[in-house]
Amino acid sequence: MKLPKISIITTSYTMDRFKDITELLDSLQAQSYKNIEIIVVAERSPELAENIRNYAQKKDYPNVVVLYNQGEWGLSSARNLGIGQASGEIIAFVDDDALLFPNWAEETARAYAEDSTIVGLTGPILPLWEDKSMSWSPREFYWIFSCTYWDWTKPAEVRNGYGTNISFRREAFDLCGSFKTNLGAKGGGESGKHELGGEETEFSLRVRRQTHKRIVYHPNIKVKHKVYRYRLSNSFIRKRAYWEGYTKAMFGRLYHSNDEAVLSTEHELLHRIFSRLIPSSLKLVFSQPGVALRQLWVTILVLACVATGYLSYTISNLFHHSEGYIVG
């Protein structure tokens, strides 16, 4: 069985992430499967691009290609630049502050080779806390810092994966184009600021509908994602949750189908929050009151902000026909 070549794309925009990138590159070079190509797309910082090149040369990493995005800034634009340079049959995306398990590439290549109905793969994104005291955060809200809340032990078909750990066959881009450049972070998402996200969700929806193939969550394709303390601040959570609600309302309208409940993933998560998270947090009130109160507070904050974002899009669409946001 011939295994495919994998092009792995990561993007970054600031020297503050240089150490993270070097650690990511080291984890990529430690992969058990060697038929990989690594493409790093830097933007907004020529110094960053130069430092990454120097690091790859110093460490003798010949499979590392460093590009500089001189066009429109943003995660989607940078990824699209990388896609244009990729030579692999599989094109994968990881965040610059992620670390891959040593068998990540091997498991990815094998999964594609064994099942031609799979057009995309994703897998567990495990939080690597800056401080262990942050681990009180409920799993149901791991999506706030781009980690997965799924705890499945067997492969399962999903609507989409997270950009911290996602890949597609080349045919997905040949048939469906690239990421929409008006979606996705424009500055790393540090503040959770005013920006439409959901670029992986939107692309995944297009790919599944046009190829009629599956996107699969595979429990053995694992990465760790660094979670810095700022991501648990009220300000970050509030903005991140608002825009999550806004973009999901947009997708629910624009990709509505009688054959598929586009927001079924969110509906299942909401049910889990009310049936599992809230009761378990209430049980902790007497034994671990600090943890219980933090969990209940973040639950209220997230639900309120997601609802506000959802209603904001819904109301604005009545007057401004917001489907124009998806074009680009």
Language model region names:
Residues 1-29:
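N-proximal low-complexity "stem/linker" segments adjacent to membrane-targeting elements
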Residues 25-68:
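Acidic donor-binding segment of Leloir-type glycosyltransferases
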Residues 69-86:
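Glycine-rich, basic loop-to-helix element that forms the pyrophosphate-binding segment
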Residues 91:
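Short aromatic/hydrophobic "clamp" motif used to bind/position activated sugar donors
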Residues 103-137:
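Conserved donor NDP-sugar-binding/catalytic core segment of glycosyltransferases
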Residues 165-168, 172-177, 183-221:
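A short, conserved alpha-helix in the catalytic core of glycosyltransferases
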Residues 240-243, 257-328:
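Non-catalytic, C-terminal membrane-associated alpha-helical segments of glycosyltransferases
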